[in-house]
């Protein structure tokens, strides 16, 4: 991970913790931060570990959005857990931390271009359309651990033999 981006990420995280400490009038431990999330997820909060993990590829491609939205989003999960315990991940407590404490819209999903981090996909067909299945789902079909059906016609999806990406 780029040293400058890593530094900025840690600074945003510390700033969020500081805002939370002022709002809740108590101290919070500084979380650890790593850059090892893979796939389409931008970040993940590990509540019991007090740790934030970020996707390094998406971070490099979308640094401003990570600094302004993703990192506060993940810190809000940690703060919510430490203040309220186990509650719904994007429930009213988390939304309150995002909006009232951090002053940020409580968005639950990102809108980043994920082509660079998207895994292999395989074409499957039913009676009415085609579907791209992830490599994980494709492998489950090959190992006969799962079958998938169309949401419209309810027919089983069958592999066409085409790898899409």
Swiss-Prot record:
Q: Which GO terms describe its molecular function?
A: zinc ion binding
An annotated GO cellular component of this protein is: cytoplasm
Cofactor (UniProt): Zn(2+)
Q: Which domain of life is it from?
A: Bacteria
Does this entry carry the keyword Nucleus? no
The active site consists of 74
**Which keywords are on file for this protein?**
Cytoplasm, Metal-binding, Zinc
The record's section on NCBIfam families has: PRK04860.1
Q: What is this protein called?
A: Protein SprT
Q: What is the lineage of its organism?
A: Bacteria, Pseudomonadati, Pseudomonadota, Gammaproteobacteria, Vibrionales
């Amino acid at each position: 991970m780029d040293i400058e981006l890593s530094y900025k990420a840690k600074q945003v995280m510390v700033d969020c913790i500081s805002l939370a400490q002022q709002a809740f009038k108590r101290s919070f431990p500084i979380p650890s931060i790593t850059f090892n999330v893979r796939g389409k997820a931008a970040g993940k909060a590990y509540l019991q570990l007090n740790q934030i993990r970020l996707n390094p590829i998406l971070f490099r491609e979308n640094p401003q959005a990570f600094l302004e939205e993703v990192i506060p989003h993940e810190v809000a999960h940690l703060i919510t857990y430490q203040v309220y315990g186990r509650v719904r991940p994007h429930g009213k407590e988390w939304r309150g931390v995002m909006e009232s404490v951090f002053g940020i819209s409580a968005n639950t999903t990102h809108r980043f271009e994920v082509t660079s981090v998207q895994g292999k996909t395989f074409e499957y067909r039913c009676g009415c359309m085609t579907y791209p299945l992830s490599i994980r789902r494709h492998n489950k079909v090959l190992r006969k651990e799962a079958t998938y059906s169309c949401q419209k016609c309810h027919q089983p999806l069958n592999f066409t033999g085409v790898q899409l990406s």
